[in-house]
Amino acid sequence: IYKNRQFNIPYFDFNRRHYLEYDLIKAINSINNSKIMKVGILSPFIPTSSILKKIDGLSLFEELKKSYDLAAIPFFSKKLPEDIDLLLIIGTNILQKEMLYSIDQHLMSGKNLVILLDSFYRINPSNNQTQLSISEQINDISDLLQVYGVKINSDKVIGDINYSSPVIDKRQNQINYPFWMKIDKKGINKDHPINIGINNLLFVESGELITLNENHEKLVYTTNQSGIVDNNLFKIYNTNNLINEFKQDNLSRTLSVILYSPFQSAFNKEENKLKNHISSSQNNPSIILFSDTDWIFDPFSLQK
């Protein structure tokens, strides 16, 4: 603990033995760096007034507060604060055009993005009233991502027979539900340091990520026993009916990916871009993208 910040070195974790030097250097650099990294959070789920308090259902944020300064950005703002080092975006189906431009320029300036989107929001169902829709114009976050190299298939929900979770239906019968995917080590890229120490993840009615170039690395993925179902059916069908709709199609699907630079601005063709517009990425930023938001909330992230 240094200057009221907690720096963890997981050197007792056998799974991270190959990354001990990396963890040590990272911790030492954090201590020597007088500037604490500021993480901006842009989400309709996080009120700006609540970020300094303990947020019910989001223990993840309490862990982040140990190492970073967190700042909740008003959801309908038109511009990001300039002092944000990293931007965390959660469930932003609707954003103003000016904010989309600000996010684009944040990335182009060399700052990283972490983005969580979804096909069906279980924890925050009001978000299901709107849906991402890729278009030729830059209208939502999915349009930005397509320019950066990935398409989110947000109108389909992914299931996997091999990762099915037991749930209770209305008749109190236990059934295996393929759309709540308990992903084990076979579906987690253990070659990337970000995943070391993760034994399983629970992705809940997730979407699919389709990469459009080679500048990426898959982080989380299904087996080849996956399938897709239209997300609108999840609003009207019960659990058993949804299971009956599921048909596996021998395809493995990507659920999380890291995109590497270089990136081109999504607004290079816009006439109203600012005079100091940055057209291509500087200093090698990256984007970490997840096709599910529910997995970070306590009901699905904390083991009981």
Predicted region positions:
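Hydrophobic targeting/anchoring helices
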Residues: 1-63, 74, 302
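Acidic, S/T/G-rich, low-cysteine, solvent-exposed domains in lumenal/extracellular/periplasmic regions
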Residues: 33, 50-304
